Amino acid sequence: MYFFRALLSPVVMWPALVSGKSNSNTANYTVEELWDLEVTFWDNFLYPANVKQVEAINSTLFTTEVQGRVDITRVFNGSELNTEYIFGLFSDPNHLSLVGVPIAYSITQFIAERNIASATTVVTFNATSFGNLLLPVTIDTWIMWDADGRIMQYDATFRWFGFLLDTLVEALATSINGTASQATAALTQLLATTVCDTHDKYCTGENQQYDNSTACYDFLTTAIPLGKDYELGRDTLLCREVHEHMVQYDPKMHCPHIGPTGGDYCVNDQTYEQKVLQKYFNVSWIVGVPWTGNIWLGD
């Protein structure tokens, strides 16, 4: 990176202007400082450090209006919502979960400039619901920090997630001495039962989504599919499994997500093209060049 900086030193470094929005944040960190910020995030992502972040309700690692996108799910706005999903989703080893809790990580790729870092991190999860199976999960991230060292934007991709789901099904098949189809059916039953138990406990009164446990179970096992690897943000059981973890923190917000309507998260409201071309981020990820064609920037 320093070699390229030397080559470009005589050149004017233009901000990336797109629809009047640029990466004009005053933060201008060194590579070492960005590395430290990256490490700080992942240190807090691990269990049990993530529990403390969840208990804070609004993690100080995020700005108040943080924007986040995860490829297999959806976009998440604001510090409270991101605290619940980024830290709360993987913070209870005793609760049924697909991947369990993160216990270690290794950053395998890293490059940084100004207030942005792009990295690949292999996170080891203890899949406590699958016999404490240790799973390496590869997560690609782009993270942008403000001048106070808080995350203002992130874009995350779970690499090889379909392969991961198949591995979990195979592990379950081995444990029940059955076929992959039998394991998938067993997983469907386990997830549906857990979602319905959570609904019965937290989604009461105005937050109730199903008439009773039987109606809940029947809907989750017959009316919607389990879901594919890219459908954790669509009308599937896997999507409701993700949001089930969050219900305890804010039933009013999250109960609809596990209900029949799916709220505004577990719904089939996007085509493939709309997903890819969604205008979302407030600040351009492009720095150092006067590029005006970033189609991901919001209006």
UniProtKB/Swiss-Prot annotation:
User: Pathway listed for it?
Assistant: Secondary metabolite biosynthesis; terpenoid biosynthesis
Identify the stretch annotated as signal peptide in this record: 1-20
One GO MF annotation is:
acyltransferase activity
* Sequence similarity: Belongs to the bfoA family.
- Membrane-spanning regions, if any? none
- Specify the superkingdom: Eukaryota
Q: Which residues are glycosylated?
A: 28, 58, 77, 126, 177, 212, 282
UniProt-listed Enzyme Commission number(s) = 2.3.1.-
Enumerate the UniProt keywords alphabetically: Acyltransferase, Glycoprotein, Signal, Transferase
**Keyword Cytoplasm carried by entry:** no
What general EC class does the enzyme of this chain belong to? Answer: transferase
Respond yes or no to whether keyword Methyltransferase is given for this record.
no
What does this chain do? Acetyltransferase; part of the gene cluster that mediates the biosynthesis of an ophiobolin family sesterterpenoid.
Q: Name one GO biological process term.
A: terpenoid biosynthetic process
By what name is this protein known? Ophiobolin family sesterterpenoid biosynthesis cluster acetyltransferase ATEG_03569
